[in-house]
Amino acid sequence: MNFLRRRLSDSSFMANLPNGYMTDLQRPDSSTSSPASPAMERRHPQPLAASFSSPGSSLFSSLSSAMKQAPQATSGLMEPPGPSTPIVQRPRILLVIDDAHTDWSKYFHGKKVNGEIEIRVEQAEFSELNLAAYVTGGCMVDMQVVRNGTKVVSRSFKPDFILVRQHAYSMALGEDYRSLVIGLQYGGLPAVNSLYSVYNFCSKPWVFSQLIKIFHSLGPEKFPLVEQTFFPNHKPMVTAPHFPVVVKLGHAHAGMGKIKVENQLDFQDITSVVAMAKTYATTEAFIDSKYDIRIQKIGSNYKAYMRTSISGNWKANTGSAMLEQVAMTERYRLWVDSCSEMFGGLDICAVKAVHSKDGRDYIIEVMDSSMPLIGEHVEEDRQLMADLVVSKMSQLPMPGGTAPSPLRPWAPQIKSAKSPGQAQLGPQLGQPQPRPPPQGGPRQAQSPQPQRSGSPSQQRLSPQGQQPLSPQSGSPQQQRSPGSPQLSRASSGSSPNQASKPGATLASQPRPPVQGRSTSQQGEESKKPAPPHPHLNKSQSLTNSLSTSDTSQRGTPSEDEAKAETIRNLRKSFASLFSD
């Protein structure tokens, strides 16, 4: 008796108690943390319990606390925690490089990345931007917008995505913003079109060389490319094979730098102009056109237009012209699809061709995302571009590698972790099985015992702060949880051989001895370990009666008799407790 009192007065008992178990006891009182088997007790001796200052009050407090936990034990699952607040993501910054004539913020109004993250639109021209790019810090853009000589916007930000709607280079206007494109690419910013393709489109002969590759791949019948000659400088420009020819100087847009040469004398004059410009030049045969053709592609949307000059100018984009939309043929689709594959892919592009009076087509140019929009569907095309940008932004990985989503409770994860065999609980006679945790742990019917301790989601499902099992708990003899009284009772009442048998059900388990029985009952079970002090049996007997509520619903006679016997043993435990 003195030995038990010394063991029960150990001050480390409260440290072994799980959080929340018997919360009404403010001083060291009754609870057990018995080892799973005699072999486990020899390897890991643990203090059994603390001294009992008031056994009667502690017993009834434990009874009331356990009765409150009984519905959770029978259900087999903890009540899921309340919904937590979702993570608020910062808005994504979209930099649109375009002139002030188009307000792109209205086309992105109400749109969200992945339906969750807001989009903040910053719009400016290349001339209003400056930046600093870093290897690990990304790209910091400084924007200073000036309207009518007055600075209206001046701020710095780190964009997440870029929509390029302006030419980055033009020799005719003296605008060279290729350094900004390099800086944006240096910062690793995604864009539509890609910054790699934007930089490659800063040289029209370079782009035309890609058309030559497509021409050799598809052939002149499927891809009719105009005949063109390239001169890196003025020195090789002696004569043209035939006249009239169209001479294009350097890199320019909107018809600038294009001259029609009728004869050899005019060609020599143009050669001197090329020498003064110190640039390259191209010549191509003049085509007496009936109308121009433009096939554009925005994402997966295709449109074809026909433009006819009314003023009689050989440049259809100069003077008066009539524009109309025509049917999209497979021939046109092949042209634009083939051109959209250059430079790693063009999300937005257009192909310009000329239809001659003899009925033949000639492809003369391809444009990227900076192409001007024409026709009656300009608003629709801008909306298509906005939808394309939002789709591209949604495909990008989120910062940190995780998508923003609210935290979810653990209960659905536990249900999904169960195997189909675990959902069907049925009595199998002749096969013993240790009982599952009664305090909200998932019921395991046909899975082996090591699998119960090896599931991480099942280890953390123990309520009231129960600690997860140790990594060495793969063997059934080492499965011991201080917060689960029923596991303590099952491990102390069954032999090691019985605890190591997997795949058993609850109904066929032999009833473990109650430590408050008489001497004759203990003699009948001499093969089992010696019972602890009778004061320790009140919680174990209590869990015996509560754990049977999970199996009593099946209504077998043996279980009813076992329940009645447990109640009788509980009464004897009360009598033994108060007699001391």
From Swiss-Prot:
SUPFAM superfamilies: Glutathione synthetase ATP-binding domain-like (SSF56059), PreATP-grasp domain (SSF52440)
Listed Polar residues bias regions: 489-500
Region of interest (A), residue spans: 1-28
Region (B) location: 28-90
Membrane topology, record value: Peripheral membrane protein
Pfam families listed in its UniProt record: Synapsin, Synapsin_C, Synapsin_N
List of residues that carry Phosphoserine: S9, S455, S462, S470, S475, S481, S484, S541
GO molecular function terms noted in the UniProt entry: ATP binding
Tissue specificity of this protein: Neuron specific. Detected predominantly in brain.
Biased composition (Low complexity): 30-39, 47-56, 419-432, 441-488, 537-553
One GO term describing the cellular component: postsynaptic density
Start and end residues of each stretch annotated as C: 91-399
GO biological process, one term: regulation of synaptic transmission, GABAergic
Record text on subunit structure and interactions: Interacts with CAPON.
Miscellaneous comment text of the record: Regulated by calcium. Calcium inhibits ATP binding to the C-domain.
Protein's name in the database: Synapsin-3
The encoding gene: SYN3
